[in-house]
From Swiss-Prot:
SUPFAM superfamilies referenced in this protein's UniProt entry, alphabetically: Ribonuclease PH domain 2-like (SSF55666), Ribosomal protein S5 domain 2-like (SSF54211)
Subunit and interaction comment: Homohexameric ring arranged as a trimer of dimers.
UniProt protein name: Ribonuclease PH
Enzyme Commission code: 2.7.7.56
Gene designation: rph
EC category: transferase
Organism field: Mycolicibacterium gilvum (strain PYR-GCK) (Mycobacterium gilvum (strain PYR-GCK))
InterPro entries named among the record's database cross-references: ExoRNase_PH_dom1, ExoRNase_PH_dom2, ExoRNase_PH_dom2_sf, PNPase/RNase_PH_dom_sf, Ribosomal_Su5_D2-typ_SF, RNase_PH, RNase_PH_bac-type, RNase_PH_CS
Amino acid sequence: MSRREDGRLDDELRPVTITRGFTTHPAGSVLVEFGETRVMCTASVTEGVPRWRKGSGQGWLTAEYAMLPAATHDRSDRESVKGRVGGRTQEISRLVGRSLRACIDLAALGENTIAIDCDVLQADGGTRTAAITGAFVALSDAVTYLGAAGKLSDPRPLSCAIAAVSVGVVDGRVRVDLPYTEDSRAEVDMNVVATDTGTLVEIQGTGEGATFPRSTLDKMLDAAMAACDQLFEIQRAALELPYPGTLPESAEPAKKAFGS
């Protein structure tokens, strides 16, 4: 099998690194790196829920995604300066929120909110999938914090782990984890969000340059699921380390639970 421009095989991920405790203040803070793509993912815990959720006894999880102005080759203005949030930003923010809500029992949170913030420090393709993969680890740390604070009605509110990866058809070949040079010329482009129990959360796929047959879709999903299995192992290894910050003194730190 011939190799890609960066030396990888078609089914090979870029080097993936997950660093917990990247910043001090949030309950969960992670730097996730997929090759040259770097995303800071934080999970902050606040008391209370949105107005439409009050009185339900259930918590909420929301997410925001943004790119720093110099995350790409050409600087872009901050959306706060423009006075509006772009459609792409809204779409990805909602994707991250949906993906993580798929793995957590919101009733176990009580009326507390977990706010996920994903800020792209450097972009080289696959920023949304990197954000989801890193945000799950940040969420896991936030759940550990809530448990130590005695705010969980269920000590294991996470039903599974969540990871995501890009997959596409480039030069007629199915490839996973596309960098920008491949993503920008892919004939088919897809993002897959999966659980460590083998189920799918979301699939976003488009024939960029041409239509594609069902058999290609099946190959892409197989490649993406196999790549996600590797990401789950990386998440698991990161979460085996002790909680990186200071937990509330009222409880003993519990051993980190990974997904299911």
